[in-house]
A protein has these predicted regions:
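Catalytic histidine-centered segment of alpha/beta-hydrolase-like enzymes
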Residues: 181-190, 194
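C-terminal alpha-helix
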Residues: 196-204
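Conserved donor-nucleotide binding/catalytic region of nucleotide-linked donor-dependent transferases
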Residues: 97, 203-206
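Flexible "cap/lid" subdomain of the alpha/beta-hydrolase fold that forms the substrate-access gate
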Residues: 1-12, 16-177, 186, 198
C-alpha cells in the first residue's frame, strides 16, 4: 500500500488470501475501508477442519509440506496438469468450469519457483493451522469493519455451513450463499461476483 501510495483501500480476498486480509484488517484497521471475501477460512471453523468425513479433503495441506512435493508435481507437465486439474474439477460446482483455462494454470505453476512458493505457504502456517484444529489458537479480536462474504454452496473444502460462526469474528457480516458455485465463486459466477463487489464498495464509508 505504501509502495503504491494508497492511503486507504478496500480488499477483496479468497481462501488463502483471506488470511492475509484478516491480518491486515486487525493490524491496520484505519487503512481498510471494507472487506469482501469469497469462501473465507477463519478461526471459527476450528476442529471441523479435521472431522472424519473431511480428512479426505485436506490431505494436500500435509502433502505440500513434504520437501519433495513441488519436485514431484512439477516433474512433468502431465503430472502438474493432473494435480492442479484435480482441484479445479473437484472444487468447482461444474467440473468443466476450468476446461478452457487449465493449460494457463499449468503454465503458471510450472514457472520457476511457483509450485514451491505456493507449497511453502502450508509449511509456514502449519503450527497455526494445527492450533485452530485443536481449538487452542489465541483469541482473535473481532474485525470491526464493513464485511461482505459470498460463499459457494457446493464447496467441498470450505463448506457453506461453516459460515455459522462468522458473526463471532466479524461485526455484522453480510453473508450470501452462491447457490450455483463451489469453491471459486468469482470464477464460476463472475458477473454476479463483480456486481456484488462494486455494490459493496459503493456504499462503504471511505
Amino acid at each position: 500500500m505504501d509502495e503504491l501510495r494508497l492511503e486507504r483501500v478496500g480488499i477483496v480476498a479468497h481462501d488463502v488470501g483471506a488470511y492475509v486480509a484478516q491480518t491486515l484488517a486487525r493490524e491496520h484497521r484505519e487503512r481498510i475501508a471494507g472487506l469482501f471475501f469469497f469462501n473465507c477460512p477463519y478461526p471459527g471453523i476450528g476442529r471441523r477442519w479435521a472431522e472424519a468425513g473431511h480428512l479426505i479433503e485436506i490431505w494436500y495441506q500435509s502433502f505440500h509440506q513434504m520437501p519433495w512435493a513441488a519436485e514431484l508435481v512439477g516433474s512433468a507437465r502431465a503430472a502438474c496438469r493432473t494435480y492442479i486439474g484435480h482441484f479445479l474439477r473437484h472444487w468447482a460446482h461444474d467440473p468443466h468450469a476450468f476446461d478452457d483455462d487449465l493449460e494457463a494454470w499449468v503454465d503458471n505453476f510450472l514457472k520457476p519457483g511457483n509450485l514451491q512458493g505456493g507449497f511453502d505457504w502450508y509449511s509456514s502456517v502449519a503450527a497455526a493451522r494445527l492450533a485452530v484444529i485443536r481449538e487452542q489458537a489465541p483469541p482473535a479480536p473481532r474485525i470491526e469493519l464493513p464485511t461482505r462474504i459470498m460463499w459457494g454452496r457446493h464447496d467441498p473444502i470450505l463448506k457453506a455451513e461453516w459460515t455459522d460462526r462468522l458473526p463471532e469474528y466479524f461485526r455484522d457480516p453480510e453473508i450470501t450463499i452462491a447457490e450455483h458455485a463451489g469453491h471459486f465463486v468469482h470464477y464460476e459466477t463472475p458477473d454476479r461476483a463483480s456486481a456484488a463487489i462494486a455494490q459493496f464498495f459503493d456504499r462503504v464509508p471511505w
